[in-house]
């Protein structure tokens, strides 16, 4: 009998898909983005870069930058009645306008 996969990227067939013209890595400016503490950011996963990638359930969520650890930013995201703390690489973040 087969077992269901419990991998990190399961159920993300459409969520982590890129448009064919956008294939490959994004521009370097996305890697070198700077955010300030208290700034609101959107979590938009970049599927071609795996380091510092948050769980796909947080794709599309908005959080607040709390600090920095190495290259990654510490982002707090409300999840129901709790506030989750995530360590996310800046390539997976976009500033809120």
UniProtKB/Swiss-Prot annotation:
SUPFAM superfamilies recorded: Translation proteins SH3-like domain
A cellular component term, taken from the record's GO annotations: ribosome
BP-aspect Gene Ontology terms: translation
Pfam family, one: Ribosomal_L21e
UniProtKB keywords: Ribonucleoprotein, Ribosomal protein
Region named Disordered: 1-25
Gene3D superfamilies reported in the protein's UniProt record: Ribosomal protein L21
GO molecular function: structural constituent of ribosome
NCBIfam families membership: PRK04306.1 (NF003303)
Family: Belongs to the eukaryotic ribosomal protein eL21 family.
Descriptive protein name: Large ribosomal subunit protein eL21
Gene: rpl21e
């Amino acid at each position: 009998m087969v077992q269901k996969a419990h991998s990190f990227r399961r159920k993300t067939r459409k969520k982590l898909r890129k448009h064919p013209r956008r294939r490959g890595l994004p521009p370097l400016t996305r890697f070198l983005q700077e955010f300030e503490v208290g700034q609101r950011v959107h979590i938009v996963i970049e599927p071609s870069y795996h380091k510092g990638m948050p769980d796909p359930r947080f794709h599309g969520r908005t959080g607040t930058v709390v600090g920095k650890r190495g290259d990654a930013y510490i982002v707090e995201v409300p999840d129901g009645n709790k506030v989750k703390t995530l360590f996310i690489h800046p390539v997976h973040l976009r500033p809120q306008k």
